[in-house]
Amino acid sequence: MKSYKNTDKIPPIMLGSSTPKEWRIPLIDWDRPPWNRWTFQNIRQILPTANIKRNKNFVSELKYNLHNIEDIMFKDTNGKDTSVSTMLEDTYTDGFLVHIDGQVIHESYYNGMEPSSLHIAQSVSKSVTSTVAGILIGRGLLDPGQMITHYLPELENTAWNGATLQHVFDMTSGVKFSEEYDVRNSDIGKMDVASSWKPIPEGSDPNEY
């Protein structure tokens, strides 16, 4: 099913008990369009989550110096002239924040999202983790040449045994892993089921996961 853009009329996805069957989220495809336009801001209604509290002693207030950048023109990957606003529309963006030199210069939200909305982070989590790890390495608290099992002994009986922290950062650990999202029986597909990210496909053997 085709997704909907921010300027399109929002379809009646999950509008209560009276929601027509065709607009109820299929759990096997909750992270695919058009469903992800709703689920990415309502992930707690799809998957179990947990609150991670911040340390109130280490909070930095954001400084703002807002500018309208949506009319800025640039060339897209096809060499065609486009604007920031068009790019945000074409990429189904929910929220867009630009932070430069300690200041927020642009902040905008779409598809019903607000500054206080909870939104799934997906692989942004890897970027945050790597950034924090880089800071810890700079402080001498992590050794990139150390074996990953030194920090996570739980991985000793896995394919990660023998890989260094640097291998993991560079994605050169050599672990065999198929990341074909459209193949249900791929490694990433099996991991999704084993981690309860996705339900067991109908007709599958639960022992495969």
Give each language-model segment a name.
Residues 120, 138-181:
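Active-site helix/loop module of the DD-peptidase/beta-lactamase fold
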Residues 1-113, 142, 170, 174, ...:
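N-terminal leader/targeting segments and the immediately adjacent pre-domain N-terminus
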Residues 84, 103-108, 147-150, 184-209:
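Short, charged, amphipathic alpha-helices and their helix-cap/turn boundaries
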Residues 129:
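Active/ligand-binding-proximal structured segments within catalytic/core domains
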Residues 115-119:
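Loop-to-helix entry region of an early transmembrane alpha helix in multi-pass inner-membrane enzymes
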